[in-house]
Amino acid sequence: MNTYVADYSALLHRANEAVTAALGPTPDGVEVAEALRTSDSLAGRIDHTLLKADATRSAIETLCGEAIEHKFASVCVNTRWVPTAAERLAGSGVMVCTVVGFPLGAMTRLAKAEEARIAVAEGADEVDMVLDIGGLLSSDLAAVYDDILGVVGAARPAPVKVILETSMLNDDQKAIACLIAARTGAAYVKTSTGFGGGGANAHDIALMRAMVGEALGVKASGAVRSREDARAMLKAGADRIGASSSVAIVSGDEAAAGGY
């Protein structure tokens, strides 16, 4: 028996009822973009991340060099730096991940979709989008769905990870967000931006895995700063880690406090 389903069956039932009431029955044949799960190694599950406003070209190039050296799954950078990362990583096997509607999720639906379209055209292999947090907290589930769907469509064929910003949500809202994301064809659900006052924890990862099953990937991000943190997230059900402390994680060193 799937213990996640057994542990979270009541929550899943409530979330299904809420989403069905707002959006209707789950449509048949939802095309889910393939979640680009990489190697079984720890490094191969990490998105090496630099999303700070003061990131420079030199810092992005260093990030890319570290990703190549350690064989991380991707680098995750703001859309401003996608062309730089794509050029630096060409032929390396390391993907370019970028963020859309980041970090607030409060852009218009059309603006998010256009940002995603441009990012993919400029070389992004994956897109991590922040969902409409205010819409979710307002119980406007149709707006949340349309927001994600627009980015998923604009980003194709690149897979989309939907950032929930779990520190701002209760468990029912987290569950509802996961089920909505699954309806759109998104490839992953993701915990956090790292800028919203909280980060990943094992409880949220297990909850998210229970809601999406094996159909979608689950990404833990924010406050993952050590090898022990990363392993705890993987054990709870994550299959991708977002971290700025990636080198420390794979080397077993202590990371500086305050990293993504």
Locate each region found by the language model:
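Short hydrophobic "strand-cap" motifs at the C-terminus of beta-strands
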Residues: 221
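Short, hydrophobic beta-strand segments that form beta-sheet elements in well-ordered domains
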Residues: 75-77
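Charged, compositionally biased N-terminal leader segments and the immediate start
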Residues: 1-46
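Alpha/beta enzyme core
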Residues: 32-70, 80-102, 108-218, 226-249, ...
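Compositionally biased, intrinsically disordered low-complexity segments
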Residues: 22, 250-253
